[in-house]
């Protein structure tokens, strides 16, 4: 019974039940300025499943500093979006290039806890993140680099838009 269990520990337990030979390491604390460098530096890839803007921007900045690819996905209500940020890829922007919010805007960005989210929307976004992770880690297929995939759950439609780096971006630009 995992109802009261931490979701990272629950996911680890489930993963081990599927494959008892794998090693799973969980981090159950909050991602913050104090631990961000240590958490990101030793990884080949980060999959962002956060639910607030402030943490997303921190994950983006730290991943860019450490040159670690980041798979960003978000879901609010019935809508979702996903893209990959790969610091070494010429065509790759970062999160702040696409969503140039400032710290003052954090409270204005909709979050799942305030706006709600349909469970199937998070399931779809998670499945797409998994596919992108496999493509990046195995270097197969065409990852969503320089492309933002939008999902509209009410019409069951996907829209892809091109996104590019902002030369004035405070995270990845030259400005």
Regions found by a protein language model. Give the residues of each.
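Adenine nucleotide-associated cytosolic modules
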Residues: 1-175
């Amino acid at each position: 019974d995992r109802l009261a269990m931490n979701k990272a520990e629950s996911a680890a337990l489930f993963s081990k039940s599927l494959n008892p030979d794998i090693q799973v390491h969980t981090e159950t604390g909050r991602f913050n300025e104090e631990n961000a460098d240590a958490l990101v530096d030793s990884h080949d890839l980060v999959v962002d499943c956060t639910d607030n803007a402030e943490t997303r921007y921190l994950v983006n900045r730290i991943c860019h500093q450490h040159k670690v690819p980041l798979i960003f996905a978000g879901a609010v209500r019935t809508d979702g979006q996903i893209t990959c940020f790969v610091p070494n890829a010429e065509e790759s922007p970062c999160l702040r290039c696409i969503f140039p919010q400032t710290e003052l805007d954090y409270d204005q960005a909709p979050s799942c806890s305030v706006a709600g989210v349909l469970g199937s929307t998070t399931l779809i976004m998670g499945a797409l993140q998994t596919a992108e992770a496999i493509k990046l880690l195995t270097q197969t297929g065409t990852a969503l680099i320089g492309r933002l995939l939008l999902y509209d759950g009410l019409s069951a439609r996907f829209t892809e838009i091109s996104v590019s780096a902002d030369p004035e971006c405070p995270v990845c630009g030259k400005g």
